[in-house]
Structure formats: C-alpha cells, structure tokens
A protein has these predicted regions:
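Alpha/beta catalytic cores of nucleotide-metabolism and tRNA/nucleoside-modifying enzymes
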Residues: 1-24, 105, 166, 226, ...
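Active-site-adjacent beta->alpha loops and helix N-cap segments on the catalytic face
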Residues: 30, 79-88, 146-150, 194-214, ...
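Bateman/CBS regulatory modules and CBS-like beta-alpha motifs in cytosolic regions of diverse proteins
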Residues: 30-44, 51-53, 82-120, 127-129, ...
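Short beta-strand/loop segments at the ligand-binding rim of alpha/beta enzyme cores
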Residues: 43-50, 96-101, 160, 216-226, ...
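Catalytic cores of alpha/beta
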Residues: 60-62, 235-243, 276, 282-300, ...
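Glycine-rich phosphate-binding active-site loops on the catalytic face of alpha/beta enzymes
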Residues: 67-82, 245-257, 296-314, 344-378
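Catalytic beta/alpha-barrel core
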Residues: 73-77, 103-104, 124-126, 164-166, ...
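Short beta->alpha transition motifs characteristic of CBS
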Residues: 74-79, 122, 126, 133-149, ...
Length: 490
C-alpha cells in the first residue's frame, strides 16, 4: 500500500507566494538586454507572447506585439484558410523586401486591381507576364479617375521610365532611390527582368519606427499559429507552412498524452525544419517525454489562467511557479526553452516566471482588453470593456476548441464539459501602451536583481512570503485616489 506521505510530491508555490531577492547591480533598467528564446531556433527581442485565444490573437495583435519585440500565436478557432490568411497578413504587414508581392498579369482588368488593393490595403501592384517578367506597375494614382472597370490593366499601368532595383540592393540604397525618384514602390528584378521582390517606402518607415521588431531573416515580422490534435491537423499545418508561419503550437489542455506525443513525432518527421511548441504540461517527466519526441519549446501551465476552471472542474493542476521550476530542473542542460503560460496578474510576475526558469511568458488577459484584440467591445455601467473567454468555455468549444479538451467528437452542446468561462476585461487602449508597462516592470525587476540579461535573471533568488507579507506588498492603509496604469486589484 502507498505510504500516505508519498501521496504528496512537494509544496506548490505560485507567483504571490514569493518575492525576488534584491542583489548588487551594475545595470540600470534601461541597460538590460531582453532578448530571449521563443523556441530552440527562434530568438525574440522581448520575452512576451500573446496567447492563442479567439478573443486575444489575430493578425492585428500579432503585428503589434511583433513590432514590440514579442510574438503572437494565431488561434485555431477558424477555418484553415482563414488562419493561413491571418498568418499571411502578419508576414506581409512589413518587410525589408516583400519576397512574394501581390501581382497582376497583363490580362487583368482595372476592376481586379481595385479589388486587390482594397482587400490587401495596398496602393500599388507590379504587373508581370506569364513568365513573371516585370512589365509595369499600377498604383492608386493610375486608377484614381479610371471609371471603366473592364479596361485592361496594361492600358493604364506605368511602363515608361519604370524605376527598378537589382537583387543586391539594400534598404539604404532603396530609400535613396525612392526619395530621388519621388516614388513609394520599388520593384526588385534579377538580370533577366524577372520580379523577385518589392520594397516600399512604408516598410522602410516601419523599420525606423520599430527598431526592436521581432523579424525573420527576410525582414518580415514573426508569427506563430496554433493547431490541435484533430483530423485536419496536417492539412492545417500544410496551409500554415505555405503562409510562411515561423512556428506552430500544438495547443492542448494536457500535453503529456500519447496522442499529442505521437502527433509531435509525425509533425517533426514531416516538417523537420519547422519549430514546434508543445503544451500544456506541469511536470519534469512530461517535459522530458516531449523533448525526446522532438519539441522545440515546452509550454507550462495547467489551470493558472484567469478564465480557466480546470483545477476546479477536474481537480487537477499545479501551482505555476513550482511547475516552471520542476520543468526547468528536468531540462537542465537542454537547449529547449520554457514558455510560462498563464497566471500573470502583475508586471512583477514576469521576472518571477523567468527567474523560475521560463525563457518567456504567454499572456491572454493582459492583452484581451487592448484595441488590437478581436474581442467584442461592450459598454457596461458607462465603462468600456472587451469580451474575453477561455478556450475551454462553452462558447469557444462550440467555435472549434473542443479538441483542445479531447472532446472533438462530442456534438451535443449539453454533453460538453467546459473547463473555462466567458468574461469581460476593462478596455486598456493600444497594445503598445500595455507592452510599455510590461517591459518596464520586467526591466525594473532585472535592475533590482542585478541581472544584465534574461539568462542572468534565472540565477536570481526567491524568498517565500506569508499572507501577511503579501498584504504588506500591496498598497495598504490608504484609499487609492487615482488608478495606476500598471496596478489594480480587480
């Protein structure tokens, strides 16, 4: 018979149970380096990730967070084609050089050009032959007074004195060409006049505006996308890869299961160069099994999220700080990074998660209230809110997240067993403003701990505190008269 003491594997701590111990520092907060790893092969400039939730991350938020140095994970509660398009919108949003620009052939009509410009929010389209040789370019100026929608694009496009650049052009040279010729689009061609890319003045401006952007080797913003353990997983992955997704996230409530491990092995066999994040787990044993199966990053978190009810409904979970530390200990010496998913309530929880062993943190509720999130904006008692729901809520499961909770084959809504709720969160303004506070809190924590970079922060020490210590940590014995942008107790 199992000894009673063996039933308990240890003490479970979460962020509110500890504080970081201050240490000698030679670094001011603005001097610290925030670069970290999202996966084994992908570096991010800010260790912050937006969650793959249908009220959090679609292309608008993914673009914004990548511009701030982090990365977004596009949720999967949508059709395969739409998710692939969401990824494509992020990859096309800005680029050193657009490698696969939207084009028109010579036989296209004015109506085709106007439709493509409206759909993709662009002001110019290169016109090519069937062999992809550049023939001209059509811009909104060419079409401004054109009323005949069935007129051939070849009759209105610019062909004379067409300004182009060679393949070896860099952004500095490209900017000079654009300025000297007072144009906004610069087609890039090879020695045989084949179109190989497009450089736009807008992209050059964006590079200057967002110097800390998280980008791939081609200068495009990075983005990840979620997939589940379902019948269409490989079809979804194929579409995402064609859209140039940087990584996929096998997103399940229980990553330490045979179906997930088998899927991971199959994905890595089929796509050996595609980085795959797997989760969610909470133990060292689970982490080792997933790494052996080929995981490029491990997502840790069973039930810490504000809208998750797994710990209450299923009685299963693991306090988040201890879960991160257990997984970190098991992966000691491994190059596979840990993503701490859920439970972040204050900016100070971010340095705590990293000190426990996470390379980055994933958040949902922090971003659900931003203007870039896809949640519905509502007015309640005179204040603006946005909807926010767990992927285990009834509403999200109906939309497509049933497989995350291993209930894919259940079609009767009355028989679904939800592990999440639907809620609302206060409207917070732009994601840039929220990220400023999150990054500021992380920098402050690193400065107090004497950590010059993320790796150094992992050496920081903790002290456990009592409930009285937590009371002392918060503002006390006063009435708050003005709200702070980075502190509230709601």
């Amino acid at each position: 018979m199992l000894d009673y003491k063996e039933k308990f594997i240890g003490e479970g701590l979460t962020y509110d149970d500890v504080l970081l111990v201050p240490a000698y520092s030679e670094n001011l907060p603005h001097e610290v380096n925030l670069k970290s790893k999202f996966t084994r092969n992908i570096v991010i400039n800010t260790p912050i990730i937006s969650a793959a939730m249908d009220t959090v991350t679609e292309h608008d938020l993914a673009i914004s967070i990548a511009q701030q140095g982090g990365i977004g994970v596009i949720h999967k509660n949508m059709s395969i084609q739409r998710q692939a398009n969401e990824v494509r919108k992020v990859k096309r949003s800005e680029s050193g050089m657009i490698l696969d620009p939207i084009t028109l052939n010579e036989e296209a009509l004015v109506g085709d050009a106007l439709r493509l410009m409206a759909e993709n929010k662009i002001g110019g389209i290169p016109v090519i032959s069937k062999e992809r040789k550049l023939k001209g370019i059509v811009t909104n100026r060419d079409l401004r007074f054109e009323k005949k929608l069935n007129k051939k694009i070849a009759d209105v496009m610019t062909t004379e004195n067409l300004v182009t650049a060679n393949e070896d052009v860099d952004l500095v040279k490209a900017e000079n060409i654009l300025q000297n010729h007072k144009i906004e689009k610069l087609p890039v061609i090879d020695e045989n006049d084949f179109l190989v890319g497009l450089i736009t003045f807008k992209d050059i401006i964006k590079v200057k505006q967002h110097p800390n952007s998280c980008k791939d080797e081609f200068g495009r913003l990075r983005v990840a996308a979620a997939v589940g353990v379902s019948k269409d997983t490989f079809e979804r992955i194929e579409a995402l890869v064609k859209s140039s997704v940087d990584a996929i996230v096998i997103d399940t409530a229980h990553g330490h299961s045979k179906g997930v491990i088998d899927l991971l092995k199959e994905v890595k066999k089929e796509y050996p160069n595609l980085d795959v994040v797997v989760g969610n787990i909470a133990t060292g044993e689970a982490a080792l099994d997933l790494v052996r199966a080929g995981a490029d990053a491990i997502k840790v978190g069973i039930g810490p999220g504000s809208i998750c009810t797994t710990r209450i409904i299923a009685g299963v979970g693991f306090p988040q700080l201890s879960a991160i530390m257990n997984v970190k200990k098991a992966l000691e010496g491994s190059s596979v990074p840990i993503i701490a998913d859920g439970g972040i309530r204050f900016t100070g929880d971010i340095p705590k998660a990293i000190a426990a062993g996470a390379s980055s943190v994933m958040m949902g509720s922090m971003f659900a209230g931003t203007q870039e999130s896809p949640g519905e904006t509502i007015i309640y008692e005179g204040r603006k809110f946005k909807t926010y729901r767990g992927m285990g809520s009834i509403e999200a499961m109906q939309k497509g997240s049933k497989d995350r909770y291993f209930q894919e084959d259940e079609n009767d809504i009355k028989k679904l067993v939800p592990e999440g709720i639907s809620a609302r969160v206060p409207f917070k303004g732009s994601l840039k403003e929220v990220m400023h506070q999150l990054i500021g809190g992380l920098r402050a924590g690193m400065g107090y701990c004497g950590a010059k970079d993320i790796e150094n922060l992992m050496d920081a020490k903790f002290i456990k505190i009592t409930s009285s210590g937590m009371v002392e940590s918060h503002p006390h014995d006063v009435t708050i008269t003005r709200e702070s942008p980075n502190y509230n107790l709601r």
